[in-house]
Amino acid sequence: MMDERSQRMRASRPVRDGQTTALSGESFDAVIVGGGAAGLSLACHLAHVGWGDAVLIVDDGNHPLEHRSWAWWTTGSGLLDSAASIACDRMGVAGPGWLKDVPLDPYAYRSLTGRELSAATDRIIGDRRGFRRVVGTVRGTDDAGADAGDAGGCRVTIDLPEPDGVRTVEVNARWVFDSVGVDSSPTPRAPEAHLDFLGLHVECLADVFDPGAVTLMDFRTDQSAGLSFMYVLPTSTRSALVERTTFVVAGAELPQAIDPRHEAHVRDYLESQLGACGYRITGREVGTIPLERRPPARPVGALIPIGARAGMVKASTGYGFERIQRHSAAIAACLARGRSPARAAPVHRWHRALDHALLRVIGDDPSHALEIFAVILSRNPAERTLAFLDEDASLRSQLRLFSTMPLVPFARAHIRAVTRRRAEGPRP
């Protein structure tokens, strides 16, 4: 369901530098670090507006694309919307004692595989001969304009794998768009809030699923380990991805592996809720998605963060693909007009505050968090709910949604947070 499932870049598409011309000393309008959703989406949007005579996409190949997928809802006007192989026009949501199936119009819920994104990228940048994808690792950047606060360009150091070892090259770039954090100091992984998920790709012996409807959140699953929900994305009447996700709060011990109870709960859901009497498992998707509450990385000179580093993954849901598209389009528009892309990232302080408030409720009072999600999903039309979750709702629409929600859990969680901060004292 969620967006951030790392998979390997297809070796047939990003070519190794040895198969083309030498890179050392070359100059690029942009170097894009990372070939996942953020990097490839940005390349597509740059090509779409006709910006850049030389753009280099560098991916280390350690995170495969083959089994990766992204999901989002959109009205169909996006650059990559037509590349999605799945588009559902209805949404199912459920909880203890209630079940709702609603039309998504004017939205559709779309799912795009890594292979589809890679193919769409090749198609869109195909006419831009200066756009190149290589396998390599960006080791660092030397930003000439960082101290001055402008973009004077960068020298980018790249390690390129070759049959007999690694070749290091330096290239020049007017802009560097970073989705991985090439110049970030490694720090111990903190126990941040995150989503812990396991999904089973199943094929049933009989018709079980409705290919036109996605089950976005079904809370009819065990809640003892934290707020949990089921998700179903059908690909036919007999096949689907059936996934279980748990919110893991900040401060909880990070697991060494995905909770083994997930699979038992998925199997129970298949049989007890969906009525699947016989099925076989054709694949698994497992992982965690950080629900980042810290401020996003900021642009420094010519180095511009993109993707999750730029705050494009929504902290309360883990969705980010549509936000990445909007950011990529904004960057491309700035560059096409001769403006700096440093301010292209939207500032959503209000929505970040709402996300943090909801995460506090999830951590302090999971039962009330379930109630809040149930109210949002069951008492509001899909258009209002999805626009709100997409941070695209009008003030009037937001107020109407808030009027349906219980406010006491938010107030209680806020008071607890303030009390904790006072007890801990000022941060060093």
Where do the language-model regions lie?
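A conserved beta-strand/loop capping segment in the N-terminal third of enzymes
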Residues: W72-G145, G153-C154
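FAD-binding beta-loop-beta segment adjacent to the flavin cofactor pocket
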Residues: S224-L227, G287-I306, G311, V361-S367, ...
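N-terminal Rossmann-like FAD-binding beta1-loop-alpha1 element of flavoenzymes
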Residues: G18-L56
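C-terminal helical "tail/cap" subdomain of flavin- and related membrane-associated enzymes
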Residues: A329-P428
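A conserved FAD-binding loop/helix module that cradles the flavin
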Residues: R309-A330
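N-terminal FAD cofactor-binding segment of flavoenzymes
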Residues: S41, H45-G97
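Predominantly flavin-linked oxidoreductase catalytic cores and closely associated redox partners
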Residues: H45, I124, R128-Y279, E292-P295
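Flavin-binding catalytic cores
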Residues: A252-E285, I304, Q325-H348
